């Protein structure tokens, strides 16, 4: 895929940061000396970590140069590096591995969770949040439009960019032997957005990217028109004119 756009991502910064706050709130109290923010994006989650542990050394990793540029501007005292978590090894002594909305993009991420957790010291924490929304209209309609004759060839593999998450019991059975405590849960957010176009703008920064990147400009325009029309039907206005974007997310907090 093309590079991520920090500007597009930050159009809904408050809504995107709320799950990071909720994940952070469930991390046990500990004196963290070194923290890694995996998939740090533009630094909004890294900023939360820096506020809670101002004495800690914090490193953020991401694959997007644009996201990292924004993160460095936001937090000049933190360290940000371009790296793929599938091949990245945390620095020795890392106490907390924090990952907000990144591992849903990582193939076989459960294997990565095990690898990362096994490297944590006693009392260290792996904290993860992943969207679990592929069955929601916002994403099902992407796949539906991709099957239209004019897009079918170019987007034959677009849906493969993300796989559905396994059942929570799969994560529990795999991770419970690796720590003294494991907390897993779902939270469903209902984001009140201005209209159907706002939902489209939201997913343009994330979920729509595998469907838009392979298309040229006229094709993207046609895809977005077809998708927006379907979104408007799936998310009717509420009493105040806004629409409710239902957004399930899955959380994991493992303590070694």
From Swiss-Prot:
It is an enzyme of class 2 (transferase). Keywords: Cytoplasm, Methyltransferase, S-adenosyl-L-methionine, Transferase. It catalyses: trans-aconitate + S-adenosyl-L-methionine = (E)-3-(methoxycarbonyl)pent-2-enedioate + S-adenosyl-L-homocysteine. The keyword S-adenosyl-L-methionine applies. Its main location: cytoplasm. GO terms for biological process: methylation. GO terms for molecular function: trans-aconitate 2-methyltransferase activity. Its EC number is 2.1.1.144. GO terms for cellular component: cytoplasm. InterPro entries: Methyltransf_25, SAM-dependent_MTases_sf, Trans-aconitate_MeTrfase, Trans_acon_MeTrfase_C. It is found in: Cytoplasm. Belongs to the methyltransferase superfamily. Tam family. HAMAP family: Tran_acon_Me_trans (MF_00560). Catalyzes the S-adenosylmethionine monomethyl esterification of trans-aconitate. This is Trans-aconitate 2-methyltransferase. It comes from Afipia carboxidovorans (strain ATCC 49405 / DSM 1227 / KCTC 32145 / OM5).
């Amino acid at each position: 895929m093309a590079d991520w756009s920090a500007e597009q991502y930050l159009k809904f910064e408050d809504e995107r940061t709320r799950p990071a706050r909720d994940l952070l709130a469930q991390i046990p109290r500990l004196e963290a000396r070194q923290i890694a923010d995996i998939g740090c994006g533009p630094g909004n989650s890294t900023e939360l970590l820096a506020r809670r542990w101002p004495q800690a050394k914090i490193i953020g990793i991401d694959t997007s140069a644009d996201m990292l540029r924004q993160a460095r501007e936001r937090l000049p005292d933190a360290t940000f590096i371009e790296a793929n978590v599938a091949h990245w090894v945390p620095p020795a002594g890392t106490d907390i591995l924090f990952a907000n909305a990144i591992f849903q993009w990582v193939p076989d991420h459960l294997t990565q969770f095990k690898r990362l957790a096994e490297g944590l010291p006693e009392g260290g924490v792996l904290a993860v949040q992943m969207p679990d929304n592929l069955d929601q209209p916002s994403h099902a309609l992407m796949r539906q439009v991709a099957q239209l004759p004019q897009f079918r060839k170019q987007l034959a593999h677009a849906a493969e960019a993300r796989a559905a998450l396994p059942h929570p019991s799969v994560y529990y059975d795999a991770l419970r032997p690796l720590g003294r405590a494991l907390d897993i849960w779902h939270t469903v957010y209902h984001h009140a957005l201005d209209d159907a176009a706002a939902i489209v703008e939201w997913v343009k920064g994330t979920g729509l990217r595998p469907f838009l990147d392979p298309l040229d400009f006229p094709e993207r325009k046609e895809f977005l028109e077809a998708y927006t029309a379907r979104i408007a039907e799936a998310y009717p206005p509420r009493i105040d004119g806004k629409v409710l974007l239902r957004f399930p997310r899955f959380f994991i907090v493992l303590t070694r």
